[in-house]
Amino acid sequence: MQTQTYELNFGPQHPSTHGVLRIVLELDGEVVVKATPVIGYLHRGIEKICENRTYIQTVPFTDRMDYLAGMGNNLGISQAVEKLMGVEVPERAEYIRVIMCELSRIASHMICCGSLVQDLGGVTGFVFFIRDREHILELFNRACGARMTFNYIRPGGVAQDLPDGWVAQCRKFLADFKGMMETYDKLIVGNEIFQMRLKGVAPLSAERAIAMSATGGVLRASGVDYDVRKADPYGIYDRFDFKVPLGTKGDNWDRFMVRMEEMEQSARIIEQALDQLPEGPIMAKMPKAIKPPVGEVYHRIENAKGEIGFYVVSDGSLKPYRWHARRAAMINLQLLDELCRGFKIGDVVAILGTLDPVLGEVDC
C-alpha cells in the first residue's frame, strides 16, 4: 500500500502562533515530516529605518522588536551607543536598569509560560499568570508612563528617577511573588497531564543546541551553562549573586522549567539591587545631539528570549551608518523544523510555545 504526505497550513492567524506566523506542515497522517516557518508578515524594516534616525531616536524602535521585554532591548542599544562614546553611566541609573530589565524578564516569562499552559488547555493557569503580570506592568507604568513600549533606558542612563513609593511597591511585589510561584507549582507544575504533554517531547542535545546557535532558555535547557550576564557581564551584573538554571534533556519540559526557575533568580537579583540602590544622578552628562566618533561596536546582553546583540557603525554623523540587531527569537525559531519532526500535530503547539517566539523580533 502506498501512502502520500500532505501539507497543512498552521497560521498565520492561528491563536497558538503567538503572532502572525505561518508554519507549513508536511504530514504523514498526524505525524510531522517537515515544518517550515514562513515569516515576514510583521516586517517593518526597523534596521533601515534606524539608519535614517538619530541615535536617540532608534531607542523606541527596539521596544517594538521584542515588545514583551522592551527594557532589555532599550538597554542593549543604549549600552552600544555608550561604548562608542565612552560614556560612564551613574551608579543609581545602573541599578535602576538592572531592576527594570529583571522585572521585564519576569513579565516576559509569565507570558511565555502562561501562553504555553493555555495552548495545552489550561485556561485557569494562563489567567493566574496574566493577573500576576499586571503588578509588574503597573510598576512600569508608574516609573515611565508606559506598560509595554517604554523608551525608558536611554544612552547615558534612564529617562527619569523612580517616583515616591515605587521601591516599597516593588518590594511588596517581590514578597507576593513567592506565593505566586507556590501557586504555579501546585496548579501547573505538579499537574500530571501537563507533564505528560511536555516530558520527552522535542529533546535537543547540547551539541545540537550549540551547532544550531540556540540561545537563552532554549540553550540552557539542553544543559549548556551559558548566560551573557555570567559569561560576559555587562553593566553591574557582576555584583549580583544568582544561579543559571539548567536542564538535562532539552525537551519541552526542561525549556518550561528553566524559565520558571529564571523568574525566581530574577526576583533574587531585584532584591539585591533594591538593597544596594544608591542615591545620585540618573543620567550622565550627554550632549544634546549624540554624535559618536567614527568606529563600530557590537554589544550583547541576555534578554528574556536569549542573547540579543546590537551592531552599530558610526561615520561621525548624527545617524548610524549601519544598525543591525541579532535577534534571539529569530535564531531559536530556526530550530522548529528539527524539533517537530517525528512528533504529532498537537505537539507542534507545545514545541512552538517552549521556543517562545515573538514575531515583532523575528520579523523586525
UniProtKB/Swiss-Prot annotation:
One of its GO terms (molecular function) is NAD binding. The keyword RNA-binding does not apply. One of its GO terms (cellular component) is plasma membrane. InterPro entries: NADH_Q_OxRdtase_suD, NADH_UbQ_OxRdtase_49kDa_CS, NDH1_su_D/H, NiFe-Hase_large. Pfam families: Complex1_49kDa. Keywords: Cell membrane, Membrane, NAD, Quinone, Translocase, Transport. Its main location: membrane. It is a peripheral membrane protein. It comes from the Bacteria. It is found in: Cell membrane. Its EC number is 7.1.1.-. It catalyses: a quinone + NADH + 5 H(+)(in) = a quinol + NAD(+) + 4 H(+)(out). Belongs to the complex I 49 kDa subunit family. NDH-1 shuttles electrons from NADH, via FMN and iron-sulfur (Fe-S) centers, to quinones in the respiratory chain. The immediate electron acceptor for the enzyme in this species is believed to be a menaquinone. Couples the redox reaction to proton translocation (for every two electrons transferred, four hydrogen ions are translocated across the cytoplasmic membrane), and thus conserves the redox energy in a proton gradient. NDH-1 is composed of 14 different subunits. Subunits NuoB, C, D, E, F, and G constitute the peripheral sector of the complex. NCBIfam families: PRK06075.1, PRK12322.1. This is NADH-quinone oxidoreductase subunit D. It comes from Heliobacterium modesticaldum (strain ATCC 51547 / Ice1). The lineage of its organism: Bacteria, Bacillati, Bacillota, Clostridia, Eubacteriales. The gene is nuoD.
